[in-house]
Amino acid sequence: MTPLTDRQGKFSPLKATTLALALLPAAVIAYWFFNHQLGPLPVKEALRHVGDWTIRLLVITLALTPLQRLLNYPKIALIRRMLGVTTFAYALTHFLLYIVNSKYDLGFVASEIVLRFYLTIGFVALIGLSLLAATSFDAAVRKLGKKWKMLHRLVYGVAVLGLLHYFIQTKIDVSPAVLMTGFFILLMVYRVFIMKRVSLTPAVLAISAVVACVLTAITEFTWYALATGVDPWRIAQANLMFSFGLRPAVIVLLVGLVPCAFVILRNLRVTEQKQTA
């Protein structure tokens, strides 16, 4: 099975579209870079943008399993491994850009990875993604058998390390890191229900959204309380003051309610079809 074909060897529009969309951010960043649109420190800016998209793609990849269950669309499984490998490619590019930004001084890069905690965990996350990418092909799946699923559960630990790296390296506003963490929390709540074989009913989805919202707010509060000099209570109050824009916890709640609304509308449609049949 190639990146653009399904298990029968036929061209897959779904895989082709997904790959094109996944590579689009890289193409845009490259365009900005070569057209001098990344400011006075283009490599550093490209490094930041690629890192942001690495986390986003990782979260999107983790969202595919619950999305497959919600939509009852098995073909989503076709793009999961491909998107995971693409996420690794972004992570590797992020690391290579860090080397370029360090003037290709590999000794300096190695020492920074050892001495700076956020770089250490970022590098460990990269190693984890490398291992997952190397075993994301059909031959590896067949060879590893049942161990393959166990191995690929490492992705959750990799995500935690990546998000922590994202938090620590953020200099001022950690809202993007909080938002991605909130989405990850939402997906983990879904995973708990799925593991317990609980159906993703509207009530379960609504509960998941509320729980993720609260945990996201707690995460943001805790970070500001422990890692910054900013009053965390001011941040907590901002979650209730929409004049400052939507805070990450609120966005997580709204996004979490979208699947709930989708399932409700789908159930209503099925009921109407049964009544008219």
Put a short name on every predicted segment.
Residues 2-277:
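Membrane-embedded alpha-helical bundles that constitute the cytochrome b-like, heme-associated redox core
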